[in-house]
Amino acid sequence: MTAIQLIVGLGNPGPEYEQTRHNAGALFVERIASAQRVSLTADRKYFGLTAKFSHQGNDVRLLIPTTYMNRSGQSVAALANFFRIKPEAILVAHDELDLPPGVAKLKRGGGHGGHNGLRDIIAQLGNQNDFHRLRLGIGHPGDAKLVSNFVLGRAPRAEQEKLDASIDFALGVLPDVLAGDFAKAMRELHSQKA
């Protein structure tokens, strides 16, 4: 069991993207920072907002890239390389079109599934895709042509409440995730639905 040393929350920078579906991962990391009572601060060296807390004697770093989504890997690779964090000790939280709002799933490895943030992270980590993912369901607009506007849009209140609930579920299993007990975390998280 590999303990998680880096949690990344994907999103786009700037007030125009706050509370959009595409920023679900960033929202998750903001909630962790709040729960741990640490402040995310800008760090140019890592192209993002960073914070650190301790869990069972281990340092856990938080990162929200301040690059645009399709350059997220630049930020992740800079921090992971500096602190010598291996891909299997990284958890990337991101929005997931293929899951309905209110559903969160953990996964290790795999492709990018069309997600530009994941695509760039895989490329910047030297084509290593063995990092963990927290997939936060946002639903699908039903037509591929509508995806861009959909992910960059704000969810209606009922959808946002479901997304918030799925983030709460994920926060509930975070101690198991941090300890590297993904089997236990997955059993618990995958049985939840808002």
Swiss-Prot record:
UniProt GO molecular function: peptidyl-tRNA hydrolase activity; tRNA binding
Localization (cell): Cytoplasm
Q: Which SUPFAM superfamilies does the protein's record reference?
A: Peptidyl-tRNA hydrolase-like
- Site annotation Stabilizes the basic form of H active site to accept a proton: residues: D95
Which residues are named in the active-site annotation?
H22
Xref: InterPro entries = Pept_tRNA_hydro, Pept_tRNA_hydro_CS, Pept_tRNA_hydro_sf
Q: Please give the superkingdom of this protein's source.
A: Bacteria
Pfam families linked to this entry: Pept_tRNA_hydro
Q: Which GO terms describe its biological process?
A: protein quality control for misfolded or incompletely synthesized proteins; rescue of stalled ribosome
Whether Mitochondrion counts among this entry's keywords is: no
* UniProt site positions, description: Discriminates between blocked and unblocked aminoacyl-tRNA: N12
Query: What residues does tRNA bind to?
Result: Y17, Y68, N70, N116
For this record, the Gene Ontology CC terms, alphabetical, are: cytoplasm
The alphabetical list of record keywords is: Cytoplasm, Hydrolase, RNA-binding, tRNA-binding
EC number(s) of the enzyme? Answer: 3.1.1.29
Under catalytic activity, the entry for this protein gives: an N-acyl-L-alpha-aminoacyl-tRNA + H2O = an N-acyl-L-amino acid + a tRNA + H(+)
Q: What does this protein do?
A: Hydrolyzes ribosome-free peptidyl-tRNAs (with 1 or more amino acids incorporated), which drop off the ribosome during protein synthesis, or as a result of ribosome stalling. Catalyzes the release of premature peptidyl moieties from peptidyl-tRNA molecules trapped in stalled 50S ribosomal subunits, and thus maintains levels of free tRNAs and 50S ribosomes.
Similarity comment text for this entry:
Belongs to the PTH family.
Oligomeric state and interaction partners are given as:
Monomer.
Instruction: Name the NCBIfam families for this protein.
Output: pth (TIGR00447)
Sorted alphabetically, which PANTHER family does this protein's record hold?
PEPTIDYL-TRNA HYDROLASE (PTHR17224:SF1)
The name of this protein is Peptidyl-tRNA hydrolase
Its source organism is: Pseudomonas putida (strain W619)
